[in-house]
Amino acid sequence: MISKINGKLFADMIIQGAQNLSNNADLVDSLNVYPVPDGDTGTNMNLTITSGREEVENNLSQNIGELGKTFSKGLLMGARGNSGVILSQLFRGFCKNIEEEKEISVQQFAESFQAGVETAYKAVMKPVEGTILTVAKDAAKAAMDYVDQAEDCVDLMAHLIEAASESLDNTPNLLAVLKEVGVVDSGGKGLLCVYEGFLKGLKGEKIEAQAPKLDTESFVNDDHDFHGVINTEDIVYGYCTEMMVRFGKNKKAFDEQEFRNDMSEFGDSLLVINDDEIVKVHVHTEHPGDVFNYGQKYGELIKLKVENMREQHREVIRKEQDGLQNKEANESKTVETAIVTISVGDGIAELFKSMGATHIISGGQTMNPSTEDIVKVIEQSQCKRAIILPNNKNIMMASEQAASIVEAETVVIPTKSIPQGISALFQYDLESSLEDNKRHMSDALETVQSGSITFAVRDTKIDGIEIKKDEFMGLAEDKIVTSDVNQFHAVKGLLSKLLNEDSEILTMISGEDADNSITNQIINWIESEYPDVEVEQHEGGQPIYQYFFAVE
């Protein structure tokens, strides 16, 4: 029987909870409702709790109150994305409730979960039911209702997990979009993984780290690991080569071991996956053509890809140098008022700088900066005042959390997109007070409509729109309004929703994957269909999104 939890046992719970979430992060990511490339709930929650776990492992204590403070601090500073911030707030309240204790009883254990829920709900401006908040609330209520019957902390935790699981299964009944897509809430699932790990820790059991599953669809990560490679010329095999071969009836019989042996002669980093009808191959080689010719001995080539890794390495070096320069600029720049913008893409960063941004933090949809990232920039600027432009709804809560931590008087302008950030920054007045700037910059968001074009990462149906993986989607604000296999048609569908007879200016920001011919086609179409609209086009260089649009 475990009637008390001390610091050591709580540390074991945290470590197992973090490990269980880490093992299931991909599963949690897969529950994301929208088919938009995303920072992803599982990834953000995993990074958040890993920060808390590392802080705990470096500052172990028998005193649960002291350990709780350490855990809470790690979560707070490492919080990424809205799901990560909510997770940090749940355990901020939990740990606040035990901060004076050396060990806690079953009753205090239950009360701490309830305290966490109350703290998290207060931190969210407009709580939505059917999310991680609901799962946490229902689980905590069940624990409080059961505490008098619980044999010990293990029994209470098991009961809490049962209630959390039931609540998670009910989330589609509370949130229509979950029911439409046929999934449970991703944040709630992530929290359940943490709770299940807690129970393992309480029982003295260990969850082993699981190797990440190989994605046979994308096959390999396009981001090659160049660590340790100093000179581009040191790369022996310069072409990352992939192929899929469908076996032919009248072709050479496939012997996997022979195939592997022969393929290994072409280079290194060989991966071969055989699923009876198709063989998938990844190899680094100097002669991609020879690889393809060899593959044709066995059947038809149905998918080919070649990437020049030497060119990629040159690009990595360039970006690292640019990043170092930006880091040094951020660290060395001291200002009276810091204007901190979260931005992705070299062109967008330069645009923000030209408009008066003093500090740029690299981040966006698939790379949410942590609370600590934002805090560090503000503190290193030694400013008296700060304005944060999150430019993404999933970075909003981390920005607000950072604003509450720093000593400088800091406000957050609720910009949910890059176009909104640009419109807000246009209204910044060096001579105005912080409150006046906050009001004027926030008011500017009412005058701009934002849109974007990106690709779908999964098949789904949202708001009656059938979406297929790899189609181009048009988003007006956060709502998917069109999806088409043809990029230009997707853009037309989106702009037809954004533009009207009152529209005056269209700002178009092209991403790194934007096609110049399509960009020109878009401009010509706008000039023809909306002759009174002035078009301003910028090279943003952002990944994931081929285009950002702002209509005023």
From Swiss-Prot:
Superkingdom of source: Bacteria
Annotated Gene3D superfamilies: 1.25.40.340
Record-annotated disulphide pairs: none
Alphabetical GO biological process terms: glycerol metabolic process
Protein's name according to its UniProt entry: Uncharacterized protein SE_0901
GO molecular function: glycerone kinase activity
SMART domains named among the record's database cross-references: Dak1_2 (SM01121), Dak2 (SM01120)
